Regions:
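Catalytic palm subdomain of template-directed nucleic-acid polymerases
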Residues: 59-84, 102, 137
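Active-site palm subdomain of RNA-directed nucleic acid polymerases
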Residues: 33-63, 180
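Short linear motifs embedded in intrinsically disordered, charge-biased segments
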Residues: 190-278
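Conserved pre-catalytic core of RNA-dependent polymerases
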Residues: 1-26, 63
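Mobile genetic element proteins and their domesticated derivatives, centered on retroelements
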Residues: 28, 43, 52, 57-59, ...
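Short, conserved micro-motifs composed of acidic
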Residues: 12-15, 89-123
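Basic, alpha-helical interaction scaffolds
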Residues: 116-186
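Conserved, non-catalytic sequence blocks in retroelement Pol enzymes and Pol-derived host proteins
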Residues: 23-33, 65-73, 89-91, 118, ...
Length: 278
């Protein structure tokens, strides 16, 4: 399947010369993601509180540091060695480092240097379509969603101006506006501040006025997705969060995790347990 494959480029109807792909799968091949997952399956961390998360060709190293640690430790060296042994080149320019620390007096994290190049330290990073910031406020993610929604209002208003049937307008709203708001919804919506939440609620209210019919509120959509996701975890023994859902001796209610901070209280597991117990 991989041996002797050729490829070429087409620009304005003209084709380039054929070239042989010597060490990669054909671009656009439906098997390429699966083959890459199989190839990188053995890349995993055995270090305590150090995890290597992979989704297709996106790889993230997550480290839980104690009060005296300021670096990822040996997991970085292990990952670089694995890349070298697996004939994979790490693009240092695209590699970013972000430290999430809620303490007021934050120690400066150690600088990461790979092949003589310093890895850029950032305050926010877009991972799998969602902006994460170093305080987990999701403000940048909310601003990005709001900006995209504003751009799509133009098309929705055009449909209203042309007196398109409300059924088609609702279909457009759910496909191009609601879908971008509710993407990875259960991860961040409950953690939003009132200002950011009102910003997204305004998108729904403006859309409802343009369509002429009220649309489902974001809180209702969030609870539906949260309930569905929590139930899927409860029926999947292999899910990493399965053990976080523990039933009380009565067997009818789940044990609510003790939350010292509002940040943890509004995170996924406590929110899901509260909803399931309601």
């Amino acid at each position: 399947f991989l041996t002797g494959r050729t490829q070429r480029v087409r620009v304005n109807g003209k084709f380039s010369d054929l070239s042989v792909t010597s060490n990669v799968s054909p671009q656009g091949c439906v098997l390429s993601p699966l083959l890459y997952i199989l190839y990188t399956n053995d890349c995993c961390s055995s270090f305590e509180n150090r995890h290597i998360l992979k989704f297709a060709d996106d790889t993230v190293i997550v480290s839980l540091l104690n009060s005296t640690e300021t670096s990822h430790g040996p997991v970085i060296d292990y990952f670089l060695k694995w890349c070298q042994e697996s004939f994979l080149t790490l693009n240092v320019l695209k590699t970013k480092d972000m430290c999430i620390d809620f303490r007021r007096a934050q120690p400066s994290p150690d600088t990461i240097v790979i092949d003589g190049q310093t890895v850029e330290s950032v305050e926010s990073y877009k991972y799998l379509g969602t902006f994460l910031d170093n305080k987990l406020t999701f403000k940048k993610n909310t601003d990005s969603i709001h900006k995209k929604s504003q751009q799509r209002f133009f098309c929705l208003r055009k449909l209203s101006k042309f007196q398109v049937d409300s059924t088609l307008m609702i279909l457009f709203y759910r496909s191009f506006i609601e879908s971008i708001i509710t993407f990875s919804f259960v991860c961040w919506f409950q953690s939003l501040r009132v200002k950011e939440r009102n910003l997204l609620n305004k998108v729904v209210s403006v859309s409802s006025k343009i369509i002429g019919l009220p649309q489902e509120t974001l809180q209702d959509l969030y609870e539906k997705q949260l309930f569905k996701k929590a139930n899927s975890i409860l029926t999947d023994f292999s899910h990493p969060l399965y053990l976080q859902f523990q039933f009380l001796p009565s067997g009818s209610l789940l044990r609510l995790p003790f939350a010292k901070t509002n940040r943890f209280k509004h995170s996924f597991v406590p929110s899901a347990v509260s909803l399931l117990n309601a």
